[in-house]
């Protein structure tokens, strides 16, 4: 479904797949435009972005609240450390694959209905996990839990693509990622405290207690943003698309209903489940996803092994293990805000320098040349600090830098993907989820056997070198040929 036929809005949202070079006319508003690109005010955009950001918070929070209790679960369910890691692995597999279904559906039926459906699934899964004492059922319900929570990340990126233009998108992507990367900071602390005071079931009771009210909040306040349904946001909605308490978010100049907005239930439907996989057919996006996924997988080498390493090397209990995740999460929060501001600055600088147009792939990856080596150096240093049994402050510092530089890199790549697929940003972000979560699942599954065989130092050295080599190769190819590939696809 091509939104160019229905939204009536010029600019990049009118393209299902955007060219790599953005015309120089973006420097100034078009005087003949009678409708703004987005009818939502700046404050309203921030409200929408913060709402979907909170939705994206639950997925990483749900996985990280659980990690400090892994040694406890192994003891209570009489399983091995490798077996308990499987419950993390299946979560990440479902985290990667479920958006392939939900994101295309949100590109057809709208963001709001899919948000509500998936969070209801998440709530029910949390309730079931709260009473689970059987290993196989724990594995199954963890997959259901992930399938409900993880769609919010891809749909959230699509929502931001609905309401923002390229020149402002970097900052909003930073705000969007803020809550998403706060989950790794507070999740382990909450999980460690709950599992130490009671047991691992308490973490799922807690998730049930917070996901229920947020589901109600979305029913009350979340607005529809999909442009083929509401245009630039000024079209009136009804039924499932209308929040129970409808806030006044639009500019006064755009309050009138927009003609020509199609009901997605009318006509022939293309659910587009294949659409995320088509993203891999474009070389520039497949290379960006590969680089992103390598960083993500190597990051989970450190976070997935932290509970066992810090318990073995430093003798920490569940609560203190959870506290050790805080620096990484704080680094993630700092990184996402910084990356958003730097992205907008990079884009404006490229726009000012260009006489023909902005080369999007180069503009969005300018700072990535710095982030990637800094991240890999942090991973290398972290591994050898743990191997040498240094004071715990040293690996904690590198946990902070790992979180910061990885998040800055993720924000750059995510923004590039949204720019290249403005009409189908949710589906494109689902493709990113497939790559990152599948490689991350592999990392979680192999990290403990690797540490047992090679030691922490060489395990993280190998991870850092592979990430650096693959990432740099991908970036060089995108820098040299990205514009040509995107132009060829667009033509």
UniProtKB/Swiss-Prot annotation:
Its main location: membrane. It is a multi-pass membrane protein. GO terms for cellular component: plasma membrane. GO terms for molecular function: transmembrane transporter activity. It holds the Pfam family MFS_1. Keywords: Cell membrane, Glycoprotein, Membrane, Transmembrane, Transmembrane helix, Transport. Residues 1-30 are annotated as: Disordered. Disruption phenotype: Decreases the production of itaconic acid. CDD domains: MFS_Tpo1_MDR_like. Glycans are attached at residues 85, 232. PANTHER family: MAJOR FACILITATOR SUPERFAMILY, QUINIDINE RESISTANCE PROTEIN 1-RELATED. This is Itaconate transport protein. It comes from Mycosarcoma maydis (Corn smut fungus). The lineage of its organism: Eukaryota, Fungi, Dikarya, Basidiomycota, Ustilaginomycotina.
